[in-house]
Amino acid sequence: MSRNKPVAKKFRLAKALKANSPIPIWIVLKTRGRVRYNPFRRNWRRNDLKV
């Protein structure tokens, strides 16, 4: 990908990068195990970002 990107696209890519993380352990403890994983996890090879 080119180095010079529009700023809006950079913001969208940064948001997708932050959203692609596991949930913190304290959330598992707080919800008593009802929320165990992030269903929106994305692998960079398998799934395509629509940005």
UniProtKB/Swiss-Prot annotation:
Q: Which Pfam families match?
A: Ribosomal_L39 (PF00832)
Q: Name the keywords, alphabetized.
A: Ribonucleoprotein, Ribosomal protein
Q: Which InterPro entries match?
A: Ribosomal_eL39, Ribosomal_eL39_CS, Ribosomal_eL39_dom_sf
Record's keyword annotation contains Ribonucleoprotein: yes
Q: Mind telling me which Gene3D superfamilies this protein's record contains?
A: Ribosomal protein L39e (1.10.1620.10)
User: Per the record, GO CC terms?
Assistant: ribonucleoprotein complex; ribosome
Per the UniProt entry, what is one GO biological process? translation
GO MF entries:
structural constituent of ribosome
Whether Ribonucleoprotein counts among this entry's keywords is: yes
Spell out the family assignment given in the record's similarity comment: Belongs to the eukaryotic ribosomal protein eL39 family.
Q: What is this protein called?
A: Large ribosomal subunit protein eL39
Which lineage do the record's taxonomy fields give for this organism? Archaea, Thermoproteota, Thermoprotei, Sulfolobales, Sulfolobaceae
Q: Which gene encodes it?
A: rpl39e
